[in-house]
Amino acid sequence: MGRQRQPQIRQRLLDACTDYALEHGLPDRLRPLAAAAGTSNRMLLYHFGTRDGLLREVLGQARRRQVEVFTDLIRLRPDEPYTTTLSRAWSAISGPQGEPYLRMFGRLHDTAGEPLWPGFRRTATTDWLAPLEEGMRRLGRPELATVVLAVIRGLLMDLYATGDTERTDRAFHDFLAAIDGA
């Protein structure tokens, strides 16, 4: 009889690999992930089947972390104008807190990432719409949630490509002023 799988070990390995990937990006080989997790390539394959299987789980875990943190940032707060909430969220998403996710998922938006996570682009778009619609409802414009998301994503791609924080911050705050005054 084979050895029983130990889910707590698997989860510890996944957590360590996810931490590594968020800090350094997705590696081309297993060795850096194994070193970060304090294990061997063979044990990673034992627990996750294949390199791509491990990378898919790392991406899923990183995405769950991102959604948890950023959904809280953009959620409606009863005593705060929603544009203030969005301003604070932008600072976090475009700053050091969001940088690991921007680096990892920015690369995944390239065509090479699609085989690892089929449907990623759609998921990465649609999972933010509900909380943005709720917040924009306060401004009487829930239909603008798609526009807000498009502006955030576009400016994040711009920031990822150029590193021009000052210009992208100014553009986002100009956008907020426009929707606040609309």
PLM region spans:
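Solvent-exposed, amphipathic alpha-helical segments
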Residues: R12, A16-E23, V69-L73, M104-T111, ...
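Amphipathic C-terminal alpha-helical segment
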Residues: R107-T111, V148-T168, A177-A182
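Recognition helices and adjacent regulatory flanks at domain boundaries
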Residues: R5, T18-L22, Q61, A112-L116
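Helix-turn-helix
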Residues: R12, A16, Y20-G53, E57
